[in-house]
Amino acid sequence: MGLRIFGLKMENEYGEDCDFSNWTPDWHQEVSSADFKLGDDPNLSTRGSRMYKRGRAGVMKPTGTVEGQVDIPRIGHYFRGFLDQYKFTAGSGSGMNTHEFWGGECARLPSFAATQTYDFFQKQIIGAMIDALKLEVSDEFLTFSSDWVYKTESAETIDSENYNRVKMDETDIPLMFYDVKVKLNNKDPDGVQTSFTFEGKNNLNVDETIGLGSRHPQKIALAQQREIDLSLVTTLDEDTMRTILDGEYGEVGAMEPSKCQILKVPLELTVDICEDPDRKMIILFPECLLKVEYDFSDSDTIETTINLSTMGTGEATLKDGSKVVTDMYVRIENKQPAIKPATVTKKSTVTANVTSGTTKVEGATVKLTKYTDSAETYSETTAATGVATISNVPLGKYKVEVSKTGYKKYTGTYTVIDGTNNLDVKLIASAAGS
């Protein structure tokens, strides 16, 4: 069975050296596809020959792409990376927390550390920033695609059987097309909308981050113009004809092109999950320029695409009632804490379950040694149940040794996370007790 999961957490500083042995992401996510590459094509020279005669390492412009299904708990991290403004409001009691994101004028966007597993090893990425984000839905799942640029990476081998995933502490239902509703110009659009697409780009200026003395980016890439394009697909019929003509001619009710006007409308996308109504998402584009495209072939239904380009001249109202001028605003209600860098070293409990075949092994010593500090160890002996409980273990990566006379010593690695830590170990009997 493959292990292909993506982990993400905000950095305190761009591209800071990250001790991944002591690092735990905010969550792990099973993604549909992932591709991280260094973009380090070599510099080649022919020196007048028909063949290459010299080659040297070229510049590194690392890029990545992650694609998957959207769920309410995790999608906030992607909006945190794409948009420059963020506000968190804690819920009262057991109520939902509110995360608000909107586009402003700040060119310095958040950066992240990330991990991506590839069955037998994982890439450890620093200085990761979202250059582009896409959401798309038609008649299946609401999907996302995120394009990243990053500073550099490292790799380490992993034990896929004992890889410790950070599990969500709340429902993470993947969103479907029937969870999504759209309002155009503050009302339900006429007719049936068969698909919606959002595409946003930050146009991060990577070229200016690479200079003398280093192959890879040396400073954070600043965002340039934010481009946001939207599209709704519908069909031309009696219900949608008026909307299509309004968009084409630039005025509501017009039957010929406007002399000077272009139609500006808000578009709002809301997500309400049938099985989980407390968790919600609203995406508002306060003011958009609207354009339509349509044609026909033979007797086929006339498909119409309503294209919208966002303007930074509309207003959105925050939860506290204040207003902001923006081209895009997102509100998410879930149980996730504020999206921010880690500031405190947490501890957790590790429960080791030691067996040999169907036998529970009593009296086995389970020892955890800090991966970066061999002097820091934590150990416990298994009870008659074969279970050893080790408390107050700081989060991070550890070397694992499990030993008992009459069995071969088990060695491996394990990452302690802020959550459930179940370590399953299978010992093999050995007459020599090795």
Language model segments and positions:
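Structured interaction patches on ligand/partner-binding surfaces of diverse proteins
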Residues: 405-431
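Low-complexity "stalk/linker" and mucin-like segments enriched in Ser/Thr/Pro/Ala/Gly
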Residues: 372-379
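Signature of extracytoplasmic/envelope-associated structural regions
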Residues: 1-349, 353-358, 366-368, 380-382, ...
